[in-house]
Amino acid sequence: MNKLNSERIEQALQLLGERLALADVGPYGLVVCGGAALISCGLVSRMTTQDVDILAMINMEADFVSPDPLPDELLRIAFQVAEDLDLPETWLNNGPSREPGGLYQRGLPEGIGGRLTRRDFGERLTVYYVSRIDQIYFKVFAAVDSGPGRHVDDLRELRPSPDEIEKAALWAMTHDRSVEFRMVLASMLRQMGFKDVAERI
């Protein structure tokens, strides 16, 4: 199976939009975060990602709605795209916002809707890439919640200012108020060079 680079992400989404139109399905608005958004917006140097992560959907009234579950027709056509392009079956998924513990379900950063970058893939598919500052929020939470590795690597490349990292840390703590989460978060901030921020949270 092929990983997704910027060209493959573009190709997959373009084909998805075309197939949605042929099937007379949609339109769908997808808010995308994670590696696919970082790569497509040129925010990081890493070249590939495993999948396209759907954070939320946007309805015809331009409101955010839950992506759990994703529409069956969207999943069916995404599977066809996977077969055509030799991609993983779950290349398009709602992993970040699945079930009660998901990012959408816990609450998104204030004002996120006004910071999205829009891309149209035909008349039936619109993708909204999450902004740099919102990626910082999500990466801070993910690095503590599921472990460092690529999350911290991405976070370093996003080069947050002390003010940005502090706001992201405070937001992350609203999603997990445990002492353990705060301790791991503070340790990570110190390792990243934000000692003063770690002492304030």
Which residues fall in each region the model found?
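Compositionally biased terminal segments of proteins
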Residues: 1-201
